[in-house]
Each structure stands twice: as C-alpha cells, then as structure tokens.
Amino acid sequence: MAAFPHKIIFFLVCSTLTHVAFSGIFNKRDFTRWPKPRCKMYIPLDPDYNADCPNVTAPVCASNGHTFQNECFFCVEQREFHYRIKFEKYGKCD
C-alpha cells in the first residue's frame, strides 16, 4: 500500500507536464487579438526629455514597413513623425 500514493503523485506530475508541453505546441499565439500599444505611457510629459526605451526585443511592425525593437521605440518614432505611421501588428514586418 505504501507505493500507491507514489503512483498517484507520479501520474499527476506527468499529466500536468504533458498538458503544459502540448498546449504550447498546438496553441499558437494570435498576435491579432492583442491590444494596440498604449503610446501615452511612453511619451514624456516634458517635451525636452528624451524617452528612455528599455532594451527588450518584442518586435512591432509599423505601417511604413519598418520593424521596431519594441512598443516604446515605435511610439517614440510615431510621435516624431506626427502620427503618420500607424501600428500594423506585433512581430516582424513581412
């Protein structure tokens, strides 16, 4: 009877790991359902202050076909071009 709880624990751990492993394979991320960047949070209140964007790689594609490193770089560039470039999608441009 002492081995019975070990079998249950082993089964529960294996089934959990299997679920986690296969859920990432079959469910691809749908970037079209993600919200557009909230650029207000990246724009400094003082016009003389330069925005300090983090060095994080999370590509954003703009309407001009340029891929930006992340939302912050896109938002800063969008402000500098007086909002002529628009958000296209998350990920690299095709």
Curated annotation (Swiss-Prot):
Signal peptide: 1-23
Record keywords: Disulfide bond, Glycoprotein, Protease inhibitor, Secreted, Serine protease inhibitor, Signal
Stored PROSITE patterns: KAZAL_2
Bridged cysteine pairs (disulfide): C39-C75, C53-C72, C61-C93
Marked site (Reactive bond) residue numbers: N55, V56
GO annotation terms (biological process): negative regulation of acrosome reaction
SMART domains associated with the record: KAZAL (SM00280)
Name assigned to this protein: Serine protease inhibitor Kazal-type 13
